[in-house]
Each structure stands twice: as structure tokens, then as C-alpha cells.
Amino acid sequence: MNHSSPTGSFRAVLLDLDGTLMDTIPDIAAAANAMRVDLGLSMLHVDIIRSFVGKGTDNLIMRALSHDLGSEMVTPDLFEKGRAAFYPHYHEVNGQHSVVYPGVREGLRLLMDRGLKLGVVTNKPTEFTLPLLRQAGLLQNMQAVVCGDTLPRRKPLPDPMLHACDMLNVAPTETVAIGDSINDALSARAAGCAVLAVPYGYNEGLDVQDLDVDAIVSDIEEAAQWIVSRLP
């Protein structure tokens, strides 16, 4: 459960993308269902696909294929066919129906006004992340972007958080990570960052109240207020 709130000289904030900065489920679900139709499978409800998000695109593809087939039926050949179908479908719809969550722009502005460095740490591949952030007008605010294919290991391992801290030239103890899922919380905790969670994201269908975080905040604007209230 929640730790006591840390205090100190925070210098950087690392934000998750899907389910934290933006609601990307409409586009992800459209691409996943188009992939399934290509492979002769029926479409899944968007709420089912929402529970697949968090551990990267390959995991999403595997779960979208194995949902009714069973993982033992998803052969390497079928997985590669799914991957070959999903990527172009997602490129086609990426950003079409995704929206920036309320409070995000206000929160980022508050953090920037107080001189904090900003970065994105996501399990989403670079080829989808950068166009999406650019289209949403968020990329220009980010001094570091670490994607699911930037390093050999992704969240929930600490590597992406540590790499982002290195890029921003800050220590993990000077950094707050904000996310919506257990992957964000585990990665940030292992890296030594403070952790905030928003309750409106995906978290693979799990209750955000069960996450090991310093606080659950209603949105990014409240997260920013939490952070700046602890600055010297």
C-alpha cells in the first residue's frame, strides 16, 4: 500500500503514455480487432482489449490472439502473422481517436513553470510513440522519451526509468514517476523513484488502489500540485 509521502528536491517527472497522458484505447482496439478479422477471428469488446494494455505491443498481440484460442494455440507462425497485420493497422489509426486526458496540459505547464524536467517512459514502440506525442502537441514538452524498444528490457523492470533519469541527468531519488498500472509502479519503485498513480487508466483490469505508490491522484494536474507542494 501507500508509503509515507516523500519530500525532497524533485527535479524531474517521468510519465507513462497509454492510460496516463492519453486515452489510446480506441485506436489500439481498432487495430487489434482489424488484426483478428484478418486472421479469421471475431472482434473483441473494447473493454477486453483494454485489459491487454501495459506490457508492450507484442504482449498485446499475444493476448489478443490467445484470448479465445488459448496461448498454446498461438504458434510462432500465427504470432508473426498477427504482428504483420497489427503494425500496419495501428499505423493507419494511431492518433485518430486518441485524446489527451483532462488535466494533462495544465499539469505539465505547472511542472514546467517550476523548472522540472519532463520525460515519457512507455512500453509502446518508438514508431508509434513519437508520432502520437507529436500529433497531440506533447512531444515538444519532453526532454526524454524512452520507448518499449529503446532498451532490451521494458517496464516493469527498472531499466527504462533509470535510462530516462540518465538522459535528464537526475538521480532516481530526485524523480517522480506517474503512471496508471502495476508496470509503472514496479518499474519506478525498483529504480528508486517516487511514484504517483492515476485511477482512470488501464492497469490490466486491476484495481489501482492495490498499487504500491506514494499517492493516488485524480489527474496529472493534481499530480503536479502534489509534486510542487513538496519542492523547497
Regions flagged by a language model, labelled:
Residues 2-51:
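Active-site neighborhood of HAD-like aspartate-dependent phosphohydrolases
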Residues 8-9, 88-120, 126-130, 158:
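Short, acidic loop-to-helix structural element flanking the phosphoryl-transfer center
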Residues 28-29, 57-61, 79, 83, ...:
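A general structural signal for well-ordered alpha-helical segments in protein cores
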Residues 1-12, 47, 112, 125-126, ...:
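Asp-based, Mg2+/Mn2+-dependent phosphohydrolase catalytic module
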Residues 37-42, 69-74, 113-114, 137-141, ...:
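Short helix-capping segments at alpha-helix termini
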Residues 55-92, 102-105, 110:
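A metal-dependent, Asp-based hydrolase signature
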